Curated annotation (Swiss-Prot):
Listed HAMAP family: lonm_euk
PANTHER family, alphabetized: LON PROTEASE (PTHR43718), LON PROTEASE HOMOLOG, MITOCHONDRIAL (PTHR43718:SF2)
Family listed: Belongs to the peptidase S16 family.
Gene (name only): PIM1
Subunit composition and interactions: Homohexamer. Organized in a ring with a central cavity. The ATP-binding and proteolytic domains (AP-domain) form a hexameric chamber. Oligomerization is independent of its proteolytic activity and the autocatalytic maturation of its subunits.
Record-listed ATP binding positions: G632, P633, P634, G635, V636, G637, K638, T639
Biological source species: Saccharomyces cerevisiae (strain ATCC 204508 / S288c)
Name of the protein: Lon protease homolog, mitochondrial
Low complexity bias spans: 145-166
GO molecular function, one term: ATP hydrolysis activity
SMART domains, sorted: AAA, LON
Organelle transit peptide: 1-37
Length: 1133
């Protein structure tokens, strides 16, 4: 560290510092060697200089002697006078120097000048005198800059991409040959070439502020260097390797604020005019730590404080009393090189002659103010073109070839024609021969060409004129090829569409240009969309191959072709299938049981089967697909239980119905060549659920169509529901195998009779029986009533339905096996209850008229109601709904209104009873027996009636007639029962010849309802025997079972439904085949409760139960009187 002790007053030091800086400014203005001038200027030289003697100073005269151009003499004299006047003003006590002088009285006369090792000449910031000097010396240049700004702006807009900037406006002049440390600005995508304007957009706030001050100081020179990474967006250079080392010295001719349309941030648009090639010598990147420590360094930044106080004298009164130290001022004002030289002068007077040869270690930098903005700065070296022979045949030939190419391009491209004309005009104004400016011609060729970044930068870096011309000719040839190709495309399109309309011509031309140039027409975006979809999918190898093939086809087809749309739709479906995606299985049995119990009452078999399914999956660690079929009457919850199962298993749910389906394409899809072709329902389910293991509910599978011109859908379901085949299900549209082995299929049906046998074999059937009265009461109380109250808006109101009302509703109105009809009636009851509640509330709230009421109050209330009505009508529909909801909430909190629906007032809500009695017959006559039948609606009672068509008579052939819309099976059963009854009666009571003399008519009530089934044999036989024995059957006995000709009782189905129907009909004894005894034991206790079972193996077991009090004598003598009359008549005849 250099330390120098001097003894001088503060005014002398300030004068010395000011003089040194003044001469530096003159050296910069004169564009001479700053190093040499600074080496001749020392503290001793200017220590005794006075303002009036500045020009007569020996150092100044020596400097004048070095200047060769006399035009600077008058200019320097004016600058010297300005400095003198300013220096005189500083001695009046109004400037910072006077304050410093007064402050120095408090300090010692001996001052230590201790510059810090880190401080250099470059840290000196120009003072106000520098600004005066710069403004005076560049006055003429600023005029040229302002005049060229408009011209440059017009030229840059003509071809902003190439940046040629050709303009008729004269370029800025008076550029310093040697420029100090300057701002470095990175340029993206294209380098700048000397002599051609270029507009750049700056977004960095620091750079924008620096450029503004540069323009204010009239030092608008920067170094522009192209970024190596064209995608990088920055306005500062942090690393020398980020840019190319060769750039241009550019002058900012104009700058104006702008705004980024995308981000909305404030930016600056600057118009640059490059002057010459330069090369980075040293880079000073922005110091980020300096920004953070700027506040801390504020107290030590003495130079900044001095300059601000000098420019604003009024602010000195409010300045903090902490005045910067004298050492700091001296350090900032006296560079290291001068202090070193001053030390050497004080040491010896003999070495003063050697000062001319001293090279200063640091550049004198009048642009020191740029460091305040923390931007990237550079020291540069000027690059001069290598000398060349103007008469060189190679250079002349290259020049001629470039001119030839320009001529050819101008004939093909009008934009080039205008640029070439402008360039020719500028050349002619400077010289009459273009061959004298080959370097400028090469730069122009590169500036207007759309070449690659590396190629253009290579041209800029070439200092050999011959090489530069060769490279420029190469990029210009490429430009010619592009122009020729564009012209060829234009001609080809014109040939194709000569006879077509103008609109079609333009469209075809656009297509041709896009096809030749490879411009995206939407297909690339579509292809990218499909490729992006499959990134998250796990496509099988076979599917991946098909996808790649279809993508290749799509990329080669025109968008207007019909096949393009077919392939696009196909790829859309192919990429919409969730290949490899599975929802996470839920193996918690308590959670699944809780969900199933919340949604449905009873259904123990279904719930146990689902819990078994979960248990097996938990043990195996995986769950394979199953096919379950729920069979039961309507309204028992087959479809809703499917949703609950999906929720319990944490699977997606999809439902579609096949009832009435006659087209196999609904299952397997259409061929994609057909217009409007779509995949089948199964593929659509996978797309919607976006998992390969959803729960798919196939509803009404028993009502699917069978055969036809469009195929058999039930046969198509075989592949879907077969566990051995559905792992490679083939959809006609996609035509690729799809794995359905993880899908859980749930089918619903009302009957198994109409389901094809092969399809039924592939399903696991679970029968859902109807509900008994006790079950219905629980369902109504726990599910139906709360739901109906909520839908009617009476959820929290005192409107209740008693249990006896629910029981009466089921007994007299809703006798079906399910609860759908019961739900409808309950909802109807609560809607009517809501109406009553609203009416009661209106009556309670309406004002009662009295003699004491005043007319004014009535009028005001009416006006108020009218105003409320008007304001309510102006509100939106949503507001009205909210208001209604608020009124209902107020109704719910009303304790005065209490509505109870009981058995007594039930008919006020649902009308008179539909069923007046529990049974059709309270007392059955002979020949009438209650049978039990199973239908799609569940179990029901089926009465069989047998009567004599006429009194017993002598006939050779007794007659038997049956009615009631019986099916073929029941007709066969009735004929069999008639024969069995004749045989059984003859064996049991041989003297009873009833069937020999009787004409019997058998009928099943409700003749409009078709009846069929093999379970009414015992009922018909009992009806015949009851008529033959003239014995009534107990009306509380119900029976079911098929009968053989010998009296064997055969097994039947639907025992649970029939038992429920018997109990619902008031039966107390139920007779069924002995083979169904196990089914009876599996019935719930609430179903068996109140029923006495009789499991009959032979019909004799039934006869003994029903006719146990009929002995042989009584049975033989039932029709004894009629037989005697008929015998006597026969003997008489």
């Amino acid at each position: 560290m250099l330390r120098t002790r001097t003894t001088k007053t503060l005014s002398t030091v300030a004068r010395t510092t000011r003089a040194i800086q003044y001469y530096r400014s003159i050296a910069k203005t004169a564009a001479v060697s700053q190093r040499r001038f600074a080496s001749t200027l020392t503290v001793r030289d200017v220590e005794n200089i006075k303002p009036s003697h500045i020009i007569k100073s020996p150092t100044w005269q020596e400097f004048q002697h070095q200047l060769k151009d006399p035009r600077y003499m008058e200019h320097f004299a004016q600058l010297d006078a300005q400095f003198a006047r300013h220096f005189m003003a500083t001695n009046s006590g109004k400037s910072i120097l006077a304050k410093d002088d007064s402050t120095s009285q408090k300090k010692d006369e001996d001052v230590k000048i201790v510059p810090d090792e880190k401080d250099t000449d470059n840290d000196v910031e120009p003072t106000r005198d520098d600004e005066i000097v710069n403004k005076d010396q560049e006055g003429e240049a600023s005029k040229n800059s302002r005049s060229s700004a408009s011209g440059g702006g017009q030229s840059s807009s003509s071809r902003s991409d190439s940046g040629d900037g050709s303009s008729k406006q004269k370029p800025p002049k008076d550029v310093p040959e040697v420029y100090p440390q300057m701002l470095a600005l990175p340029i993206a995508r294209r380098p700048l070439f000397p002599g051609f304007y270029k507009a750049v957009v700056i977004s960095d706030e620091r750079v924008m502020k620096a450029i503004k001050e540069m323009l204010d100081r009239q030092q608008p020179y920067i170094g522009a260097f192209m970024l190596k990474n064209s995608e990088e967006d920055t306005d500062v250079i942090t690393d020398k390797n980020d840019v190319y080392d060769v750039g241009v010295l550019a002058q900012i001719t104009s700058a104006f604020p702008s705004k980024d349309e995308k981000t909305g941030t404030e930016t600056m648009t600057a118009l640059l005019y490059p002057h010459r090639r330069i090369k980075i010598d040293e880079l000073f990147p922005p110091n980020e730590e300096k920004e953070k420590s700027k506040e801390q360094a504020k107290d030590t930044d003495t130079e900044t404080t001095v300059v601000e106080d000098a420019n604003n004298p009024e602010d000195q009164e409010s300045t903090s009393p902490a005045t910067p130290k004298l050492e700091d001022i001296v350090v900032e004002r006296i560079p290291d090189s001068e202090l070193q030289h001053h030390k050497r002068v004080e040491a010896t007077e003999e070495e003063s002659e050697e000062l001319d040869d001293i090279q200063e270690g640091e550049d004198i930098n009048p642009t020191e103010f740029l460091k305040n903005y923390n931007v990237s700065l550079v020291n540069v070296l000027n690059l001069e073109d290598e000398p060349f022979d103007r008469k060189s045949p190679v250079i002349n030939a290259l020049t001629s070839e470039i001119l030839k190419v320009f001529k050819e391009i101008s004939q093909l491209n009008t934009m080039f024609r205008e640029q070439i004309a402008t360039f020719s005009a500028s050349i002619q104004s400077a010289t009459t021969n273009i061959f004298e400016e080959p370097a400028r011609l090469a730069d122009f060729a590169a500036a207007v060409s759309a070449g690659e970044e590396d190629e253009l930068q290579d041209i800029l870096s070439s200092l050999n004129i011959e090489h530069r011309l060769e490279k420029s000719l190469l990029v210009l040839k490429k430009e010619l090829m592009n122009a020729e190709l564009q012209n060829k495309i234009s001609k080809d399109v014109e040939t194709k569409i000569q006879k077509r309309q103008r609109e079609y011509y333009l469209m075809e031309q656009l297509k041709g240009i896009k096809r030749e140039l490879g411009i995206d027409d939407g297909r690339d975006k579509l292809i990218d969309t499909y490729k992006e979809r499959i990134k998250s999918l796990k496509l099988p190898d076979s599917v991946q191959k098909i996808f790649d093939d279809e993508i290749t086809k799509l990329s080669t087809l025109e968008t207007s072709m019909s096949e393009f749309g077919v392939i696009r739709n196909y790829l859309d479906w192919l990429t919409s299938i969730p290949w490899g995606k599975h929802s996470k299985e839920q193996y918690s049995i308590p959670r699944a049981k809780k969900i199933l119990d919340e949604d449905h009452y009873g259904m123990v078999d279904v719930k146990d089967r689902i819990l078994e399914f979960i248990a097996v999956g938990k043990l195996l660690g995986k769950v394979d697909g199953k096919i379950i079929c729920f069979v039961g009457p309507p309204g028992v919850g087959k479809t809703s239980i499917g949703k609950s199962i999906a929720r319990a298993l944490n699977r997606k749910f999809f439902r579609f119905s096949v009832g009435g389906m006659t087209d196999v394409a609904e299952i397997k899809g259409h061929r994609r060549t057909y217009i409007g072709a779509l995949p089948g329902r199964v593929v659509q389910a996978l797309k919607k659920c976006q998992t390969q293991n959803p729960l798919i509910l196939i509803d009404e599978i028993d009502k699917i169509g069978h055969g036809g011109i469009h195929g058999d859908p039930s046969a198509a379901l075989l592949e879907v529901l077969d566990p051995e085949q559905n792992n490679s299900f083939l959809d006609n549209y996609l035509d690729i195998p799809i794995d359905l082995s993880k899908v859980l299929f749930v089918c619903t049906a009302n009957s198994l009779e109409t389901i094809p046998r092969p399809l039924l074999d592939r399903m696991e059937v679970i029968e859902l029986t109807g509900y008994v009265a006790e079950d219905k009461v629980k369902i109504a109380e726990q599910y139906l009533v709360p739901s109906a109250k909520k839908s009617a808006g009476l959820e929290n109101s005192h409107v209740d339905m008693t249990e006896d009302a629910i029981t009466a509703l089921m007994k007299y109105y809703c006798r079906e096996s399910g609860v759908r009809n019961l739900k409808k009636h309950i909802e109807k009851i609560y809607r009517k209850a809501a109406l009553q509640v609203v009416k009661k509330l209106s009556i309670e709230d309406s004002p009662t008229s009295s003699a004491d009421s005043k007319p004014k109050e009535s009028v005001s209330s009416e006006e108020k109601a009218e105003n409320n009505a008007k304001s309510s009508s102006e509100k939106t529909k949503d507001n009205n709904s909210e208001k209604t909801s608020d009124d209902i909430e107020a109704l719910k909190t009303s304790e005065k209104i209490n509505v109870s629906i009981s058995q007594k007032n039930l008919k006020d809500y649902v009308g008179p009873p539909v069923y007046t009695t529990d049974r059709l017959y309270e007392t059955t006559p002979p020949g009438v027996v209650m049978g039990l039948a199973w239908t799609n609606m569940g179990g029901c009672s089926l009465y069989v009636e047998s009567v004599l068509e006429q009194p017993l008579h002598n006939c050779k052939h007794p007659t038997f007639e049956r009615t009631g819309q019986l099916g073929d099976v029941m007709k066969e059963s009735s004929r069999l029962a008639y024969s069995f009854a004749k045989m059984y009666l003859a064996q049991k009571f041989p003297e009873n010849r009833f069937f020999e003399k009787a004409s019997i008519h058998l009928h099943c009530p409700e003749g409009a309802t078709p009846k069929d089934g093999p379970s009414a044999g015992v009922t018909m036989a009992t009806s015949f025997l009851s008529l033959a024995l003239n014995k009534s059957i107990d009306p509380t006995v119900a029976m079911t079972g098929e009968l053989t000709l010998t009296g064997k009782v055969l097994r039947i189905g639907g025992l649970r439904e029939k038992a429920v129907a018997a109990k619902r009909s008031g039966a107390k004894t139920i007779i069924f085949p002995k083979d169904n005894l196990n089914d009876w034991e599996e019935l719930p206790d609430n179903v068996k409760e109140g029923l006495e079972p009789l499991a009959a193996d032979w019909y004799n077991d039934i006869f003994q139960k029903l006719f146990k009090d009929v002995n042989t004598k009584e049975g033989n003598s039932v029709w004894k009187a009629e037989f005697e009359i008929l015998d006597a008549k026969k003997e008489k005849d």
